[in-house]
Amino acid sequence: MPADLDPRTWLSFETRGPGERDWVKLYLIAVAVLIPTAIFQLFTVFLLTLLFTLIANGHGDSGLANVLPWIVVGGYFAWATSALIVPLGAGRYLADGIGARRPTAEEADAYRDATSSLPLDGVKRLPKSLYVLDRHELNAAVVGDAVIINRTVFDSEYMAAVIAHELGHLNSMDVRVSCAANRLASLARLTEPMRTQTTEARRSGQQLGCLWGLVMLIVRGCSGGLQTTMMGPAWASWWRLREYAADDYAAGLGQAEELARFFDENVVLYDVPIRFVWMTTQSHPPTALRIERLRAHLERG
């Protein structure tokens, strides 16, 4: 294998690619640590169902209360896990969420030209949708079945290399695992502003009242915020290895030199030291090591 991997990770290196199969154990751990949250969710939906049916009908519907929690909580976990098969709508959702737009005719032509310049015979998946993000950084991302490319990439000489790297993510489990993990964490991220504001208010000595305290108890118990935070460094370790794998894929498409130059001229200058990186959510490895690995591909021919 060309160049050693960044050793600052506890995940394994396998012959099929850096960390390719590690997502299985990570996802199972992510689900397992959410079991207490799932139990709290079941209990909460059970009590709320009894309360609402009591108010509406004059008596609690125990039959509905015994069934509905399993439908709601089970549906949530099934929805998250379904992304491992088909991350339906993930690309459009993120594109809308960050303000990406449809490409102009000129941008669409540039994308087709860059893609057609790659040897695509062995490529199994291509993005079905293209979005453009009006930002100055030279960057791109693939989410679901969509690729989102920053506008300035279209004016650069590195577009084919950037696309080749993103194809590496698309033609592996990266995109689907990322979507599934994000869905598992969606309740935590959705409620994070509320939880943070409440914590800050309490630290400042504000009296929030018993009712708000009960609401926040339910929110905290159902969101899985602590578990999501615990899993962050583990997922980041996996992603650092997957960035190497996507670089390898781009090298396999003949873009090793171009991608190395892209990193050397546009990315490495912005790297900063990350203390105890295995304890952080830093998802990209040091750029210098990525450049070294890509150039080792060239030396091997």
Residue ranges and their predicted role:
Residues G97-S117, L241-F263:
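Membrane-cytosol interface motif
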Residues P2-A100, P127-K128, V132-G252:
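A Zn2+-metalloprotease active-site environment signal
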